[in-house]
């Protein structure tokens, strides 16, 4: 489907910015294809999608999804993927399809802000140029700033705790809902998971689109899939592709 057809990243940019200790050789990470399937089709895969270089110089690889999924819930486009920077591409995909206008608000449910500095400018001429920007010039921690710089996003509301999610009021205008499932990682200490799910479901129902990252480095992927299934379990038409 479009640019996401499955490919290897083999250079030192984007999420491939770690190098082996003994050789100047870039790591090799897999980017899954995007398919139209429902929640029940979420599967893990055996190829590495992220790596971390530890202080002793060793590389640890992390594994993600077999396929990225897209489907609709109540007419709202949903995208599920592993590394969070892919969200930027899907925002542009829906923007180019006139789902929303530039200057849209982003509601960001996550452990992290994902707003580390990124001085690179997006070439917005088409989705292909956006795709390669996402792969080569972004990583999981710095993909939001370029969207603010281009004007695609007008503002960002950061919901990084249970308290802020549960006390958040729906904005008046259009918004994108961006979710990192590591928000429900055990160390976050969520006390009422179902209540946070219910608030998230409401935000999904009103959104122009929803992007969901499983974040292999920050969350066990079996747990991520389980949480996504629980989140959508109470939503009608949850697997409409």
Which residues fall in each region the model found?
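Conserved alpha-helical scaffold segments that buttress catalytic/binding sites
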Residues: 2-241
């Amino acid at each position: 489907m479009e640019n996401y057809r499955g490919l290897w990243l083999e250079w030192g940019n984007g999420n491939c910015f770690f190098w082996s200790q003994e050789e100047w050789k870039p790591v090799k990470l897999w980017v899954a294809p995007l398919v139209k399937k429902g929640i029940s089709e979420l599967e893990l895969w055996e190829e590495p999608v992220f790596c971390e270089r530890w202080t002793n110089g060793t590389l640890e690889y992390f594994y993600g999804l077999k396929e990225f999924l897209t489907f609709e819930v109540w007419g709202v486009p949903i995208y599920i993927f592993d590394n969070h920077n892919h969200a930027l591409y899907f925002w542009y995909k829906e923007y180019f399809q006139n789902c929303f206008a530039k200057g849209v608000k982003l509601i960001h449910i996550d452990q992290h802000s994902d707003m580390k500095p990124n001085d690179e400018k997006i070439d917005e001429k088409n989705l292909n140029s956006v795709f390669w920007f996402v792969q080569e010039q972004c990583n999981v921690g710095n993909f939001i700033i370029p969207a603010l710089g281009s004007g695609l996003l007008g503002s960002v509301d950061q919901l990084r705790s249970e308290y802020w999610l549960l006390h958040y009021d729906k904005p008046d205008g259009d918004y994108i809902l961006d979710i990192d499932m590591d928000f429900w990682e055990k160390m976050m200490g969520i006390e009422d998971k179902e209540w946070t799910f219910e608030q998230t479901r409401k935000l999904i129902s009103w959104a122009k689109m929803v992007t969901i990252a499983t974040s292999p480095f920050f969350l066990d992927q079996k747990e991520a899939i389980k949480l996504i299934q629980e989140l959508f379990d109470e939503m009608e038409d949850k697997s409409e592709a």
